[in-house]
Amino acid sequence: MLTLKLLRENPEFVIEKLAKKNFDAKEIVAKINDLDQNRRALQAELDACLAEQKKKAALIGGLMKEGKREEAEAVKAEVAALKTRSAEIEKTSQENNAELDALVVLLPNIPCDLVPEGNCAEDNVVVKTGNEIPELGENSLPHWELAKKYDIIDFDLGVKLTGAGFPVYKGKGARLQRALINFFLDINTNAGYLEVEPPVMVNEASGFGTGQLPDKEGQMYHATADNFYMVPTAEVPVTNIFRDVILANNEFPVKMTAYTPCFRREAGSYGKDVRGLNRLHQLDKVEIVRVERPEDSYAALDEMVAHVESIVKSLGLPYRILRLCGGDMSFTSAITYDFEVYSAAQGRWLEISSVSNFESFQANRLKLRYKDAEGKTQLAHTLNGSSLALPRVVAALLENNQKGDRIEIPEALRPYTGFDYID
């Protein structure tokens, strides 16, 4: 959430920057500043009214002691009138502030200067590539056919049990899932991330804190009986650990990692992009989250990108790193790097990770602050990234490593799987 101070002092800057995200903020910013001016004027009037009320109320006892009953009664009437006026101001102020709050949360985060111009995924900038794309034989199969051939993932059974997008992993397929989760978590914890196991359902305040609400209700599974939301990513519960927290200056860096199943409605998805593991409603994902001082957050972002790259490299998957353009960025992000791996049998790139710096956008919603070196309270910066999302990693591993009548497991994973190949 953008600060009222920024919107008040630099409205044209905000409008210009949000245009980079294809967001026309002119009318909203103008309305916000009108309401903010009203807010401050009403607060000043209320403060003056309460001060006068307190001042006059203090006179009543003295007047009564002096026997000036009529004067005391007159002052009482004035105090009563001031109380009535204070209540009227408070009611008007509450209505004004509710409208103000509802508008401020509609504004996305400002993209940083590193973000390229552009409207869609085609305008994203490839900043790095790595690992060779394998050449597969003529009889190579996409992962959904390999899954059926080796009986390791049952998509039809998932449809029977729940619906499309809820696969059942079996045998070596299930063991591969478990191996990848443990592999990713071990790499993260060895890099200094504290492992946590959060709930997979969150309340509305948590969804608001990280920016999923009120922006993404339609993409989240909602348990209406208790007003809980299934997590779309571990980012939500892990970052909300720090909601309403003031960190000491010596507590940085804050580094956490978590595995959770993630749940996404993905309404409206169709076509070749949803075959097999390409797009699911339930998926396994390991996340890394950081909280940093503002001056350290971009160095932390570079560390996170390098960290995720090292994981992808170790799996031997051909990959590329993209810096997202303004028009393809999320509502909450100031800058995002996507990682994609090449699916040789499908002949296309698959996204497996997004690493983002949100600067103070989430922290302002969360009231996540810290005491700086001078003892002043400041908003912290938050960052997160997938390390990694499993479904498309599994898809690429199966497709790219099919050799003859078996699928070879990357060397780095073998201590975790307990087997060298799937046949």
Region annotations inferred by a language model:
Residues 1-134, 152, 156:
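N-terminal alpha-helical targeting/anchoring segments
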Residues 129-423:
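TRNA-recognition modules of translation machinery and tRNA-sensing kinases, especially anticodon-binding
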